[in-house]
Amino acid sequence: MHLNKLSLFNYKNFSEAGFDFDIKINCFVGKNGIGKTNVLDAIYHLAYGKSYFNPLAVQNIKHGEEFFVIDAELEKNDRTEQIVCSLKKGQKKVLKRNGKAYDKFSDHIGFIPLVIISPADRDLIVEGSETRRKFMDSVISQLDSTYLHQLIQYQKVIVQRNALLKYFALNHTFDNDTLSIYNEQLNEFGKSIFEKRKEFLEEFIPIFNVHHQAITGSEESVQLVYESHLFEKDLLTLLQENINKDRALHYTSSGIHKDDLSFEIDSHPIKKFGSQGQQKSFLIALKLAQFEFLKKQSGVKPILLFDDIFDKLDETRVAKIVEMVNSETFGQLFISDTHPERTEAIVKSTHQTYKIFNL
């Protein structure tokens, strides 16, 4: 699978731009603020139906304009496909495949397997548990549409249950029968999501460990630890036990929406005890493991986006990535960098075909 062409209209800082891509390596070089990352983000947008860097869709429209369009042609399974994502102010975003609009964006997730490695990934370490849950969910959802559906349904029920708890508080009333209906639904969806997260991590963690060892070449011990209330008790029991707490807080305090994926080094939080270099290695290993997991499960090499990562890597880690490109581990690769000479030297050393776009 690879992208052939990309056209942008009023997307972020681009009024209009078009690119014809190499099937292997494509580099976007230029000064900071010129739009290199925005091209990568447009490609991400096509895969996930949203920006990696700005979740507020309307803010991706070029300042002073009324709409944006991202239009791409790609080859997948020997077929040419057209994907178009567009948004007009005041209207819903539209995502089309070969001219036909998706009824639900979730039906598109997984059609373009894609992994991004970016300085923004540091949020996975420094931000709260929601960021790490989203990482888990995005990987699983690209391969399992049932999981994504269950996740969406679970989140809807959480919103409804929380609204009911607020209603009880405002009206000084309580109806356990109605609450029990939501509890049963959460238990049904939550149990399945919990089991699938466990299954995913059982396979993912060994892949992560291999990549971390390859990148660092060191003996330091790193861990991904899944934390969930459901290891202790089933969700129905937890919801019943915490009812007084939930009524006081006006929201649901236990469930898979509180899960976390703890990042550790030598059994301590890497956020506090890992150096910058150790944190970078951890995140790159995490994303390369995501790439390998998706490739293994789908049989398709995901598109890989490297956003400004050479600034953050020493020569040893760059050499490791070059080695992986040469081994045909990767499929199509998109790179952004501020240093044209460095970029060209790196891609030349891979002995693969490439294009460099000076923005």
Swiss-Prot record:
Q: Write down the superkingdom of origin.
A: Bacteria
A Gene Ontology molecular function term for this protein is:
single-stranded DNA binding
| Keyword DNA-binding in record | yes
Kindly indicate whether the keyword Cytoplasm belongs to this entry. yes
Pfam family membership, one: SMC_N
Instruction: Provide the protein's localization.
Output: Cytoplasm
> Which Gene3D superfamilies would you find in this protein's record?
P-loop containing nucleotide triphosphate hydrolases, RecF/RecN/SMC, N-terminal domain
- Which NCBIfam families does the entry mention? recf (TIGR00611)
Protein name in UniProt: DNA replication and repair protein RecF
Which gene is this protein's source? recF
